[in-house]
Amino acid sequence: MDKATILLECGLAADMTAEQVEKLTSIASSGEYPEGSTLMGEDEQSRDIFIIHEGLVSFKMRPPVMGAEPTASGEKPEDLEILFFRGIVGELSYIDGLRRSATVVAMDSVKALRLPESRLTQILESDPLFGYIFMRNLCAILCKKVRHASEELKNHLFL
């Protein structure tokens, strides 16, 4: 599958012109991650966005320790959720600049596009309309995730 199709299907390139989609594909790099490999680690400072388009990833997070750094517990990270193909990970760190909140590990052979933070920010800032459309699309994706999490929480609390 080509980069443009992946970006359109995941929603990041929705409502973009062909020229804008080309800008996005020009900075996207394809990567393959074998089972067990880490795409990003909890507490890392990186801000790249990944678009998973084949395979499954697991989100792992260490349990918190009162008054300690998030990774200071020494306990084994726990699985949080599984994301299927065409899912976006890393968007929160891109937006707020904070460290990664979870480790993302390939559960099988994973293929992903990577949008490097520095190049993405550069093209978003150089074309305000493009930047607006991209951020609007990213917000729509985040809203879907929050709504899904709210439903899961509601189902968990009221069952």
Predicted regions and their residues:
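Cytosolic regulatory regions built on CNB/CRP/Popeye-like sensor folds
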Residues: M1-L159
